[in-house]
């Protein structure tokens, strides 16, 4: 499928109608879903109605924005009024939100056409989209492999051309890791840049909504639309949003790029290292001043995250008890058995595991030893990044230690699965913007991602570095053969 700009030109020159573009996307979804399973719900009727509205605006001679008539997928942990929002969990299988999330509201106002709700790991807890209670999404480059997670459906849908762009959420790498494994661009904005109102919470101090696209430009256009202050989100930042399109300059002269030393070494696949090193050399050829930078506490990100995130999850998920909404167990003996049976039957294994870890870390005897200590280490990780950004504009490293693994390969070994987010987690702990973009393939033709990290609210720096690299290579033009 063409880029946002190309489709916009087709629309305003009447070469194609929004209805035709939407029908083409729905046809691709119809053909690929039996083997790909990117979507939990396909909203065809609503999509066609939105497309006709855009066509009516054009027929009336009205100007339309860049996203008008563009097919988009929405991760199924964002509330969509009147449309089921399941979070990939049995406990929310029949939940129909009575309100719209800020992000989906903004996209609808911009004329974007939602073609469906995408699959995810249950409550966004996972790195492979195998934890969904409903289906396992395949990787478009090899459907026997995982697309990454937790926003695997959103990444796979864009890679497979089922939609032009999509929306995901990122708590510890849930946008960037699937973007890397599916060979697309995924951006996690600065914490607070995009409203979380209507996003079903996993870990509130880490969650952030962001865009997926086939190109850096498409991701920038989508970010432009969803970023901005929202009084309904108390963590939303009251800042002026720059014009991100002005950052799309294919030149890195004078830019300082730091390579995080700690991300290379044990656990990193040889081919991934080779491809990423080659991409870093390319940045130098584009005029960037490349230097090694040490972030000594980077390696503590994973254990720190697996105390903080489950602790917040155990509190956030306490609300699912069968009383007000969602699944409720049949014929409980009393109130207590209604609570326990609803949660035992409604939550999947990984969600239960994280609730247990979090409850343990927050318990009176262990609070100081675990939760409080993790928060102190989080501050130290943040300080490492602050020090690094005193001497560089952008940091780079691999997005993931390996390429996409086989479905079922790591489900019995949670620790091995958790290591998939080794490179992405510290960025969330520090609240920084991070982007993954394709930088090559391994010997089996599986995509490899390069991660670029910026300072707080310096999405412009990240987008410029990513755009310059992308424009000097052909990786973004590759498509899976489905």
Swiss-Prot record:
| Catalytic residues, chain numbering | 75, 150, 174
Q: Which GO terms describe its biological process?
A: translation
According to the UniProt entry, its GO molecular function terms are: ATP binding; glutaminyl-tRNA synthase (glutamine-hydrolyzing) activity
Q: Does the keyword ATP-binding apply?
A: yes
Q: What's the catalysed reaction?
A: L-glutamyl-tRNA(Gln) + L-glutamine + ATP + H2O = L-glutaminyl-tRNA(Gln) + L-glutamate + ADP + phosphate + H(+)
The record's listing under InterPro entries reads: Amidase, Amidase_CS, Amidase_dom, AS_sf, GatA
Q: Which GO terms describe its cellular component?
A: glutamyl-tRNA(Gln) amidotransferase complex
Top-level EC class, please?
ligase
User: What Enzyme Commission number(s) appear in the record?
Assistant: 6.3.5.7
Keywords assigned: ATP-binding, Ligase, Nucleotide-binding, Protein biosynthesis
The similarity comment for this entry is:
Belongs to the amidase family. GatA subfamily.
Give the multimer and partner information.
Heterotrimer of A, B and C subunits.
Cited function: Allows the formation of correctly charged Gln-tRNA(Gln) through the transamidation of misacylated Glu-tRNA(Gln) in organisms which lack glutaminyl-tRNA synthetase. The reaction takes place in the presence of glutamine and ATP through an activated gamma-phospho-Glu-tRNA(Gln).
The name this protein carries in UniProt is Glutamyl-tRNA(Gln) amidotransferase subunit A
């Amino acid at each position: 499928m063409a880029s946002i700009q190309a489709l916009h030109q087709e629309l305003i020159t009447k070469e194609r109608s929004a209805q035709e573009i939407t029908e083409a996307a729905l046809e691709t979804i119809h053909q690929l879903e039996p083997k790909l399973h990117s979507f939990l719900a396909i909203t065809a009727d609503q999509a066609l109605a939105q497309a006709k509205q855009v066509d009516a605006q054009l027929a009336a001679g009205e100007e339309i924005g860049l996203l008008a008539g563009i097919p988009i997928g929405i991760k199924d942990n964002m509330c969509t009024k009147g449309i089921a929002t399941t979070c990939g969990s049995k406990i929310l299988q029949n939940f129909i939100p009575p309100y719209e999330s800020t992000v989906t509201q903004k996209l609808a106002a911009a004329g974007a056409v939602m073609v469906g709700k995408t699959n995810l790991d249950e409550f966004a807890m996972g790195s492979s989209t195998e934890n969904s209670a409903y289906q396992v999404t395949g990787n478009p480059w090899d459907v026997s492999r995982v697309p990454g997670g937790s926003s695997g459906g959103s990444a796979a849908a864009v890679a497979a051309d089922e939609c032009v762009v999509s929306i995901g959420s990122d708590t510890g790498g849930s946008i960037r890791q699937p973007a890397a494994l599916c060979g697309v661009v995924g951006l996690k904005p600065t914490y607070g840049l995009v409203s979380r109102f209507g996003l079903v919470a996993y870990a509130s101090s880490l969650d952030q909504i962001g865009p997926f696209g086939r190109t850096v430009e498409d991701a920038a256009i989508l970010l432009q639309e969803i970023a901005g202050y929202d009084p309904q989100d108390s963590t939303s930042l009251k800042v002026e949003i720059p014009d991100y399109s002005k950052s799309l300059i294919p030149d890195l002269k004078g830019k300082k790029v730091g390579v995080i030393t700690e991300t290379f070494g044990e656990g990193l696949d040889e081919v991934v290292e080779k491809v990423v090193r080659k991409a870093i050399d390319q940045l130098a050829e584009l005029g960037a001043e490349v230097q090694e930078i040490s972030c000594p506490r980077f390696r503590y990100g994973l254990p720190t995250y697996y105390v903080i995130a489950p602790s917040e999850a155990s509190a956030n998920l306490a609300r699912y008890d069968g009383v007000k909404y969602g699944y409720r167990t049949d014929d409980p003996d009393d109130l207590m058995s209604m609570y326990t049976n609803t949660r035992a039957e409604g939550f999947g294994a990984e969600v239960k595991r994280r609730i247990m870890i979090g409850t343990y870390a927050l318990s009176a005897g262990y609070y100081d030893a675990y939760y409080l200590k993790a928060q102190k280490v989080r501050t130290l990780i943040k300080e490492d990044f602050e020090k690094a950004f005193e001497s560089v504009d952008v940091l780079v490293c691999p997005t993931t230690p390996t390429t996409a693994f086989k479905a079922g390969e790591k489900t019995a070994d949670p620790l091995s699965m958790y290591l998939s987010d080794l490179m992405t987690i510290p960025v969330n702990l520090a609240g920084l913007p991070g982007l993954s973009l394709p930088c090559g393939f391994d010997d089996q033709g599986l995509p490899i991602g390069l991660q670029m990290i910026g300072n707080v609210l310096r999405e412009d720096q990240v987008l410029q570095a990513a755009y310059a690299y992308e424009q000097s290579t052909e990786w973004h033009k590759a498509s899976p053969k489905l």
